[in-house]
């Protein structure tokens, strides 16, 4: 089965052809990230306008790269929520029109389930049950995937998502958007123990909170500026990264230990962070 997938929940317009849910035949991404970077983050109105501008050509290229037409596609899938409402509407309406015109089934996909399912593309032998940490700009969830379409949320952020905290800390430190890669790059030359940042306490064993941690960094930087003292960007980036990644890894591994999960995976943009992957991998070996 060949499925045309369409994604437009944030600042990237994407389309892909996937075979049997495991093999990517083509994958095309059109992004407005450079334009968004001028504002230090995603501007919803700009994102929506760029989706409307890019989506037709993006889908056409995905089909062309796969050497297919809509006649070869068995279904159209589209992310329907959550996301920036204007951005989501562009993708959903385009997908609805395309599916109707081609006489193909339309499959709505939840954003978080899409993040989780991306692991099926890179881990061909992966199958439920498994535990997944979804960490992105809008979400920080620990999810038990009990079956192919059955999920149980064990924990989540009670305020800021991990990726959002990364972006705001990056902006405070004068690092470019997107914040995740920028903080990680700066952290390579820093001391992760240079700044003593707080460990947030939150109700719910697997829940997380990053608002206080983000605020602690902002206050540290502002206090130093008011006193005319320098802030070591590399050290602060490393200290923040170490704290937030330690929290995420600890919560995930604690859930894995308590549930007896035999497989643990990561999803979302923050999952690209090398330190987080190292912490989870090292900890998983001890379970």
Model region roles, listed by residue range:
Residues 13-18, 132, 140-144:
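Short beta-strand scaffold segments in enzyme catalytic cores
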Residues 87-95:
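Glycine-centered tight-turn and secondary-structure capping sites
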Residues 66-72, 94-111, 118, 283:
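Nucleotide and nucleotide-moiety/phosphate-recognizing core
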Residues 78-81, 98, 136, 264-273:
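Glycine-rich beta-strand-to-loop/alpha-helix junction loops that act as flexible
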Residues 109-131:
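Conserved phosphate-binding catalytic cores of ATP/NTP-utilizing and phosphoryl-transfer enzymes
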Residues 124, 147-191, 214-215, 219-223:
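Glycine-rich phosphate-binding loop plus the immediately following alpha-helix
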Residues 185-264, 274-287:
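A contiguous, well-structured pocket-lining segment that forms one wall/lid of small-molecule binding clefts
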Residues 2-82, 111, 115, 234-236:
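N-terminal beta-alpha supersecondary unit
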């Amino acid at each position: 089965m060949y499925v045309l997938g369409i994604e437009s929940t944030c600042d990237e317009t994407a389309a892909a052809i996937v075979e049997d849910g495991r093999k990517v035949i083509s994958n095309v991404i059109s992004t407005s990230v450079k334009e968004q970077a001028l504002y230090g983050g995603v501007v919803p109105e700009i994102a929506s306008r760029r989706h409307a501008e890019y989506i037709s050509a993006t889908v056409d290229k995905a089909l062309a790269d796969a050497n297919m037409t809509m006649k070869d596609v068995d279904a159209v899938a589209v992310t329907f929520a959550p996301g920036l409402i204007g951005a989501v509407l562009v993708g959903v309406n385009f997908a609805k029109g395309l599916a109707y015109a081609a006489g193909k089934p339309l499959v709505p996909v939840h954003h978080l389930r899409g993040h989780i399912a991306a692991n099926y593309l890179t881990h061909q032998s992966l199958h439920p049950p498994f535990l997944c940490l979804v960490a992105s700009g809008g979400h920080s969830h620990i999810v038990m995937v009990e079956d192919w379409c059955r999920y149980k949320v064990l924990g989540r952020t009670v305020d800021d998502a991990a990726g959002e905290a990364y972006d705001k800390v990056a902006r405070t430190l004068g690092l470019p958007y997107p914040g995740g890669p920028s903080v990680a790059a700066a952290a390579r030359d820093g001391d992760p123990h240079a700044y003593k940042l707080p460990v947030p306490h939150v109700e719910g064993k697997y829940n997380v909170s990053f608002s206080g941690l983000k605020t602690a960094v902002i206050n540290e930087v502002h206090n130093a500026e008011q006193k005319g003292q320098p802030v070591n960007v590399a050290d602060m980036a490393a200290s923040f990264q170490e704290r937030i990644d330690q929290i995420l890894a600890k919560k995930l591994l604690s859930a894995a230990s308590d549930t007896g999960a035999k497989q643990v995976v990561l999803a979302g943009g923050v999952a690209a962070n090398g330190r987080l992957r190292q912490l989870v991998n090292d900890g998983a070996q001890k379970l």
